[in-house]
Regions:
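Polar, low-complexity export/assembly segments characteristic of proteins
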Residues: 1-239
Length: 239
């Protein structure tokens, strides 16, 4: 049984409850104040997954009078999720995401008349808005025509929601791989710069200075020995 949880005919679940359940894989991405903390690709992944969850959950709704408020609230959460998806697609330069979002907008526009009958308006940018008075009074049978398991709108939306989520997942994986490569490159560069070997020892480059200095010291000691013993006072020593 789904998380819509038919807790009882007297239990009312808010649209925020449904929105959180749709964004269960990343609930902060479903919160307006938190969305700015994520990259565009992370939002695309979260929105795609949430939309997939929405089109799975909505068809399981009861669409009965005792679930009246819950049904409408779940659709309100769907509207927010759908709009979030369009937002993340619009801020992305990825053509696959753009195509999937465009297909979803085209599908939704085909049902503009049915949506209008339950108080949902399609705006010029493709986003959805509910008109409170009609949305709250429209017959539930009209909601069922759009959002039940047999509804073509849900079935078609599910296909492109899956594509959108899959592309978002691929983009995030690619971003993570690039980040890991940069970290590895930075770590390798740091080790090369400070001369650290794998054993942790630090090697100093030998430019011949150490050898020359040792030779000079050795020759100086020999010179001191000769002078102190009085032998070879007129000897010329070439260093």
């Amino acid at each position: 049984m789904s998380n819509t949880a038919y807790i009882g005919s007297g239990t009312t679940l808010s649209s925020k409850y449904y929105l959180r359940s749709f964004y269960r894989s990343n609930r902060e991405a479903g919160t307006s104040s938190k969305r700015r903390e994520f990259s565009g690709n992370q939002l695309a992944l979260a929105d795609g997954r949430a939309l997939r969850q929405a089109v799975r959950r909505l068809p399981s709704s009861d669409f009965s009078d005792d679930q009246d408020t819950n049904t409408r609230n779940s659709v309100l959460a769907y509207i927010q999720t759908y709009n979030n998806m369009l937002s993340s697609a619009g801020s992305s330069s990825d053509r696959t995401l753009e195509r999937s979002a465009k297909q979803l907008k085209n599908i939704t526009s085909e049902y503009s008349s049915e949506l209008d009958k339950i108080g949902i308006t399609i705006n010029d940018d493709g986003t959805l808005t509910s008109r409170t008075t009609l949305f709250e009074s429209a017959d539930l049978s009209k909601f069922k025509e759009l959002f039940s398991a047999d509804a073509a709108y849900m079935q078609r939306t599910s296909t492109y929601a899956k594509r959108f989520a899959s592309r978002g997942e691929a983009l995030v994986a690619s971003d993570n791989n690039r980040l890991m490569q940069k970290k590895n490159a930075a770590a390798t560069g740091s080790s090369a710069t400070d001369g650290t070997t794998t054993s942790g020892a630090t090697e100093s480059p030998d430019d011949g200075t150490a050898t020359t200095a040792a030779q000079i010291v050795s020759q100086s000691l020999d010179l001191d020995t000769l002078l102190n013993t009085g032998i070879g006072k007129n000897i010329n020593i070439i260093l």
